[in-house]
Amino acid sequence: MTPLDFTEWLPIRAFEQAGSWQLDWAWFGTAPLARPFFSDDVDDALRLPFNLALRRQTGLDALFDWQARSPGLEPSLLVFHTSRCGSTLLAQLLRALPGHVVLSEPPPLDALLRVHYRDPTASAWQADAVRALFSAYGQRRCGDETRLVVKLDAWNLFEAQLLRRLYPEVPCLFLYRDPLEVVVSQRRQPGLHAVPGLLGPSGLDGLPGREAVAPGDYLAWMVGHLLQAGFGLCAAGEAVALNYRELPDALWGHLGPLLGIDPAAVPHLQAVAGRDAKRPGQAFSADGEAKRNEADEATRAAVERWARAPYQALEALPPPPLVNDASHSLPKPPNGDFSMVAN
């Protein structure tokens, strides 16, 4: 059988069918991934006449074959986050730099990162599939691509060790924010992980104390565990912590050497930062104070109980030394030991 050619095609969905994992592909041509989220780019691509007329569905073998025939870029930066903390702004800023391919929460990646929760035997092929998926996304469709930045879903913090084993030399960032502001944002517009049972099997399911959490405390409990997981990464030297309030200046400030920011690009990045990351047609408007004022006493109490301690632990981490070459791993800050305690 002649191997399939996926030039200018990208995987848009990974799913299990009749006991085997399948991929849906769509043709993107040479159009860059320019929207705030990968799913937005997929929506645009599926409106193209070509994709209305022709779709491709394959097994994982085709993905592995394509990786062998046309190796793509490997990740140059992994971005973990708590959600609602500026990760989309970071992605949009890096997307504005020449040669950068930015994957923003692609659902096929999330599906493969969490496949072992559904099928324990998947651990035999999961890592290879994730690497092959990155290769497919890292194809040089425009010809000038040099870096592949991957922004994970917030709950993929619990799969961070798999990614660190695959890419131990790749720098990682962990973005976080005052948990009260995150919880209020999730109350306004809940994400998949903000509603128990909606996300499906994930690392949140096996966390201790879940049964004892009152329904009204779930968001604060969930955000607290995301902060704790991020702290663990940063304290072990596996990621650099970045508070929302440091954005966007940190990108061309102390993180500039790590991210390879050319000083000549700063005016352009500053202009991009002035737009709303999720609604680029609108100007950015800070909302932290409004979110804090919106929180009622019960929400404040839940955040203090479940999320304040890991947030303070992150704030207490020493700043990382500057990195002069983004192709090398991050130097490790002093190790820390932290356990989240419900007061």
Outline where the language-model segments fall.
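PAPS-dependent sulfotransferases, especially Golgi type II membrane carbohydrate sulfotransferases
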Residues: 1-68, 211-219, 223, 227-241, ...
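PAPS-dependent sulfotransferase catalytic domain
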Residues: 4-232, 236-247, ...
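A polyampholytic, Gly/Pro-enriched intrinsically disordered region
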Residues: 121-132, 191-206, 285-294
